[in-house]
Curated annotation (Swiss-Prot):
Motif (JAMM motif): 173-186
Record-listed Zn(2+) binding positions: 173, 175, 186
Stored CDD domains: MPN_DUF2466
Annotated ranges, domain MPN: 102-224
Keywords noted in UniProt: Hydrolase, Metal-binding, Metalloprotease, Protease, Zinc
Gene3D superfamilies tied to this protein: 5' to 3' exonuclease, C-terminal subdomain, Cytidine Deaminase, domain 2
Annotated SUPFAM superfamilies: JAB1/MPN domain (SSF102712), RuvA domain 2-like (SSF47781)
Molecular function as annotated in GO: metal ion binding; metallopeptidase activity
Keyword Protease part of the UniProt annotation: yes
Name of the protein: UPF0758 protein Swoo_4561
Organism, as annotated: Shewanella woodyi (strain ATCC 51908 / MS32)
GO terms for biological process, alphabetical: proteolysis
Superkingdom of the source species: Bacteria
Recorded family membership: Belongs to the UPF0758 family.
Length: 225
């Protein structure tokens, strides 16, 4: 039965308007984005199939077009609707850390870095460049691949910092395994970067490791001082 045939007020869009989005299940929220069903499935059934196939809402939104379109009822148009929702969220997050924004909210930084790095299938080492008042200058992805003490070059970090005239930095990288716990190599990299940056009087404020559902902060663990 299509959602249009449901009793008045019971469809996901009606429930969202009446009760708020927080009262909807993941499948119902996804159904609102999909708008309608296909191949004999209503939008909620299609959304449930997507979640069951990929294992969760986040995994659905991170899936590629070819992966999504393999499922019955899904095509390029519905994939585009999902990607647009992801992009809107990403752009709002990026606006919150736009150039000149004073970085005073740790949760804002965590949210931004999580959105930037969590769903990468490979490791990315990035740097958030700040001025002397901790206003954002730029977010830059520096290295990709296997991040270890041999693949992160302090001289490249120093060169970028000098070029952008940064006074402080936050470095970060992701663990595609989903486990955010820092490795011994992560700690060695941090020490090398801290020493290199100190030679040009630039502060390393934090090193954040992004996992599947959490971020580990070196500063919070007392590993930066």
């Amino acid at each position: 039965m299509g959602i249009k045939d449901w009793p008045d007020g019971e469809g996901p869009r009606d429930r969202l308007i009446k009760f708020g989005v927080s009262q909807l299940s993941d499948a119902e929220v996804l159904a609102v984005l999909l708008r309608n069903g296909s191949q004999g499935l209503n939008a909620v059934e299609l959304a449930r199939n997507l979640i069951n196939e990929f294992g969760g809402l986040r995994e659905v939104l991170a899936a590629s077009q070819s992966q999504v379109c393999r499922l019955s009822g899904m095509g390029p148009v519905k994939f585009a609707q999902l990607r647009a929702a992801v992009e809107l969220s990403s752009r709002v997050s990026a606006q919150n850390l736009k150039r000149g924004k004073i970085l005073s909210d740790p949760d804002l930084t965590r949210d931004y870095l999580m959105r930037q790095l969590r769903d990468r299938a490979y490791e990315v080492f990035a740097i958030l460049l700040l001025d002397s008042q901790h206003r954002v200058i730029q977010f830059v992805e520096l290295f990709r691949g296997t991040i270890d003490s041999a693949s992160v070059y302090p001289r490249d970090v120093v060169s970028l910092v000098l070029e952008k005239k940064a006074a402080a930095v936050i470095v970060c990288h992701n663990h595609p395994s989903g486990v955010a716990e820092p490795s011994h190599a992560d700690r060695r990299i941090t020490e090398r970067l801290k020493c290199a940056l100190s030679t040009i009087d630039v502060s390393l404020l934090d090193h954040m490791v992004v996992g599947d559902r959490e971020i580990v902060s070196f500063a919070e663990r007392g590993w930066i001082d």
